[in-house]
Amino acid sequence: MAGPHPVGDPAPDDGLLPASAAVDAFVRDFGVYLHVPFCRVRCGYCDFNTYTATELRGVKQSDYASQAVLEVEAAGRILTASGVPKRSVATVFFGGGTPTLLPVTDLAKMLSAVRDLWGLAAGAEVTTEANPDSVDAAYLGALADAGFTRVSFGMQSAVPHVLATLERTHDPERVPLVVEWARAAGLDVSLDLIYGTPGESLADWRASLEQALSLHPDHLSAYSLIVEDGTKLARQIRSGEIAPTDDDQQADFYELADELLAAAGYDWYEVSNWATSDAHRSRHNLAYWTGQDWWGVGPGAHSHVGGVRWWNVKHPAAYSERMLGGLSPAAGRETLDAPTRELERILLQSRIRTGIPVASLSAAGRIEVASLIADELINAKAALAGTIELTLRGRLLADAVVRRLSD
């Protein structure tokens, strides 16, 4: 289970948003995230808001889709009553947890509720996450028939001892099969990898990258393992049972990923994400990084509309109680002030290749550009043309770049 909620104000039971949420809504895209908070087992490194069967306090997975639909319907009423104009949905993303633990009919039911309420924009991106051992060819075909366009498989590694440390439940041999089945169903394919697992060597990481690239995914994400407080992995490291990966090793892993992916024709478009073309970038995640609007459905889901951010109660039992009681599931919220929105803009947009317009920075930030070029943290040619774009070194030190641009 995830950590504590963010610090914010209590959310009203009716969920109504302040008038500021409606300002300039039509200049922002609108997406929907649907959180499915169920997993067969809890991986030792995972800090996401997920629950195994023994942690559900009597809540039934089979009831979840209907309750999520209740929130979708409530979202329509809340946005309308708050004066936020109705917009078609540009992206839909099912995350978790393991969304594909639910029957396809349940995912289709939730997607239909989104489509019926708001409509899907032309060419809308509809993604679900999946574990390689949670789907088969028939399931993936049914996803495509229901309107899904993309599947993101949690491959994580191709090396058995790394998967064992992460406590992943699939065999490496399963990944090529599910990719083949997804392709046959007409779905775009993304693979998620994790690097820096304790005990993982650079040769192990190379093997995982080469295996992933041999499958020719449209998109690949490579995330550094972050050891979160409260997880089993954190306890193992604290007790000395497992040795953590140091920062220099993490940098070596990242540099190898960028080298192999670039050689295979993948372009980085966000610090941890690469795609074969602009068309295969994750548009849903780009919406997060560029400050668009989205409604997050489900326990622990976060939403953002016009500078107003809120988050739902975490446990499925609490979520079920509020949905069946006709109350908003929001536990808290905050309205971002101008300085906070500006800091978040720099924090998020500096990570993407399209970058930040130099002219949009503060005077102090613009002055800092020259020293960032000198330190080889940003691309000199791009900066002189008016855009902040991180170099490879800058991607490794992205947090430092943000501090210097925003101080």
Stretch-by-stretch model annotation:
Residues 392-407:
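Short, amphipathic alpha-helical interaction segments positioned at domain boundaries
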Residues 35-50:
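Local cysteine-cluster metal-coordination motifs and their immediate loop/turn environment
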Residues 362-376:
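Short amphipathic alpha-helical interaction segments
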Residues 385-391:
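Minor-groove-contacting beta-hairpin "wing" of winged helix-turn-helix DNA-binding domains
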Residues 1-33, 40, 86, 380:
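Flexible, acidic/Gly-rich N-terminal and inter-domain linker regions that tether
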Residues 15-29, 49-363:
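C-terminal scaffold of the Radical SAM
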Residues 373-385:
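A short, conserved structural fragment
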